[in-house]
Amino acid sequence: MKLTLEGLKNKQDWEAAGIALPSYDIKKVAENTKKAPAWVHFGAGNIFRIFIGGLADTLLEKGEADKGITCVETFDFDVVDKIYKPYDNLVLAVTLKADGSTDKKVLGSLTEAIKAQSNVPEEWNRLKEIFVNPALQMISFTITEKGYALKGADGAFFPFIQADIDNGPEKAGSAMAVVCALLNERYKAEKAPLAVVSMDNCSHNGEKLQNSILTMAKEWLAKGFVEEGFVEYLSDEKQVSFPWSMIDKITPRPADSVCEDLEKAGVEDIAPVITSKRTYIAPFVNAEGPQYLVIEDKFPNGRPALEKAGVYLTDRDTVNKVERMKVTTCLNPLHTALAVYGCVLGYTLIADEMKDEQLNKLVHQIGPVEGMPVVTDPGILSPADFVDEVINVRIPNPFMPDTPQRIATDTSQKVGIRYGETIKSYVAQYGDAKKLTAIPLAIAGWCRYLLGVDDEGNAFERSADPMLEELTKALAGIEVGNPASYNGQLKSILSNVNIFGIDLYEAGIGERIENMFLEEIAGPGAVRATLKKYMA
């Protein structure tokens, strides 16, 4: 059985293997979409394929849509050549359930895959053709937060962005320049309206995307590449809207165990590949079942019936509240605590950590106990139910191959939101954050993790982080097993408002974190002993 249009003709084989196939005519959907695309998506990776592609598939199955999604890859063009084209743009979606069973379905909703290459006329002209079509209703994005960044920490444009500014729309290279150039084509054609929707997992994502597109447009205006009217078009939300959204579905890299099961079931050529850009991707995508997408309902040219596929459509304030609930209380703070302690305690699977008595207690304390008193309640979702599902269904799912090492990536960029916001809320409500124990313990655990030595005294490789070098320098001289080597090195980190959003000493917990950290560097087994002490 091959995952191709030809291969799907053997319906009985797929059904016998327990793999559901689309009931709609995949070729017809592709033809409809090609003629008049309604939805274009930038960032053709895993969460897009299973979640967003799955939404479109649901609408097609229900007869609520007759078009799919046009996929555009902006970063790793190998994905198009190795994962889309050889498989006729089909995806095998595998939902991993906590009881060990899986739901498997082929999605036929991704109708075309294009590379965002302005230097390849065939690709570039096709994108222009799509963008000038008035039928286009929305473009969406999962390109990660980094994909929107135009400037480095020094406030200067990245060199590749400066090159895009200098070279103009016809030679766009970065995702933001490509999108801005294509929006300019739409403006020049007939100024048709459009919704530009970030679906990346970062707060105020619509605002980030809007700022980046507008910055690029204004830089081009200053150089004479675009008209003043183009900037006005982008600035008018009745013409071009930038709705905010909140997305949530844990989508780990393709698991070997899933690949083996599919091969045993008779599916051929399904193994993951590693692209030249180091993307680990396969013809199948595996993910958890629970999923949430909340979008600000601001679509000036109409939209697909997303609510029929389980998407929450609401106002901006509610989107913001849902996002804040998730990232500051109900999911992300728990994940980060498990990530840093998991690495130090030698875990390689997040789910296994939930069987660890102290770590289980830690996440119960961080979310339901310490987070809930100051949680943001969005109204459309219950924070208590959400965190209950996270702790009892989502994180303990043993078939989710998610690792503490993956989640520990870029922690310096996350602790301000994941812990700093709750700490600030405690200061606002109680005058200080001294009531907190589990959150300071999580922060102490991150500092201990930064030493790159596990609880048995062995070195381990820390995950990538833009501040890793700076943080390593700040902690210089500290030796595990020699508490006397600590001379206040944590102070510059814990007082750094750029990291935590607040000076933790002013919040009343800086010294407490230092003391916990000191206990954790006492020697082999000290991290476990410290967790036992505070999470008894």
What are these regions (language model features)?
Residues 1-42, 46-536:
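Substrate/ligand-engaging "lid" and interaction regions
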